[in-house]
From Swiss-Prot:
It comes from Brevibacillus brevis (strain 47 / JCM 6285 / NBRC 100599). Residues 7-154 form the N-acetyltransferase domain. It comes from the Bacteria. Its EC number is 2.3.1.-. This is Uncharacterized N-acetyltransferase BBR47_38600.
């Protein structure tokens, strides 16, 4: 199987993210997120990736959200927001995206994401469910959630 690694917040990772910019979709760009983390000197990297040899071929940004901001889960609790996930075009259909999502699930906390780039089928296949849209809470997003046992959706 694939090894999912937490990516360091440094200029080498920024260089690797440039390859995604060349081939990837603008909506999935994580370059600005990484630059902000470098500036803030954030030691807890929210970025995870999979390498094929020495090439970063799949990545995701996964942010831990404090339970006091939880508007999705019952009981209210800390959860993860899987902000973005991307696999380079030549490496798709090889389960790299699945490995990243399973890594996020391994933390055992609920996960919220937004379906981007018409990826609804992928999120459904990964066991996520669409959330009933709430204008005040979702503000134009299309949220999907994954619930571990003993966690339910808020009404």
């Amino acid at each position: 199987m694939f090894e999912v690694r937490r990516l360091q917040i440094n200029y080498k990772t920024l260089e690797e993210f440039q390859k995604f910019r060349e081939f990837g979709l603008e909506e999935l760009s994580m370059k600005e997120d990484l630059e902000a983390n470098i500036v803030e000197n954030d030691s807890e990297s929210p970025f995870y990736g999979i390498y094929d040899n020495d090439l970063l071929v799949a990545r995701m940004s996964l942010y831990k959200i404090d339970g006091k901001y939880d508007r999705y889960f019952q009981p209210a609790q800390d959860y993860y927001e899987l902000w973005k996930l991307e696999v380079l075009p030549d490496y798709r259909s090889k389960d790299y995206g699945t490995a990243l999502v399973n890594h996020a699930k391994s933390f055992g906390a609920p996960i919220k994401t937004n379906s981007r780039c018409r990826a609804d089928d992928f999120w459904l296949k990964m066991g996520f469910t669409p959330v009933k849209y709430n204008l005040m809470r979702d503000r134009g997003e299309n949220p999907y959630v994954w619930l571990p046992e003993s966690v339910e959706l808020q009404d």
